[in-house]
Amino acid sequence: MILACDVGLKRIGIAVLLNGVILPLEAILRHNRNQASRDLNDLLREKNIQVLVVGKPNESYADTNARIEHFIKLLDFKGEIVFINEDRSSIEAYENLGHLGKKNKRLAIKDGRLDSLSACGILERYCQQVLKNR
């Protein structure tokens, strides 16, 4: 199974590829990086993940890239790790919330649904860029 994550300072959005369908999962709320890495490790084991797709912004965001790489190194994951450009994934996910009212959009941001929708976009890019070439 393949899992994608959108690593942020407060939340980690999660999506999985299940039988060819991309599904958002409940986001991991970060209290600190050790707790968040434990929670992600548990999920990777529980779902028997073989490939972890991680969204990273372009090189001009050096601090963010370093933070994401450091976080991923905290994981005890033996499968394949693939980094995919995540530029605009959060913006695209937010645009997909157009059907929600203002209050529900704010709630979707706060509870991590937006982050998991962003992870769906990252996983979709992985499928388009990597899986179609296999």
From Swiss-Prot:
GO terms for cellular component: cytosol. Its EC number is 3.1.-.-. CDD domains: YqgF. InterPro entries: RNaseH-like_sf, YqgF, YqgF/RNaseH-like_dom, YqgF/RNaseH-like_dom_sf. Pfam families: RuvX. NCBIfam families: PRK00109.2-2 (NF001026). Could be a nuclease involved in processing of the 5'-end of pre-16S rRNA. This is Putative pre-16S rRNA nuclease. It comes from Helicobacter pylori (strain Shi470).
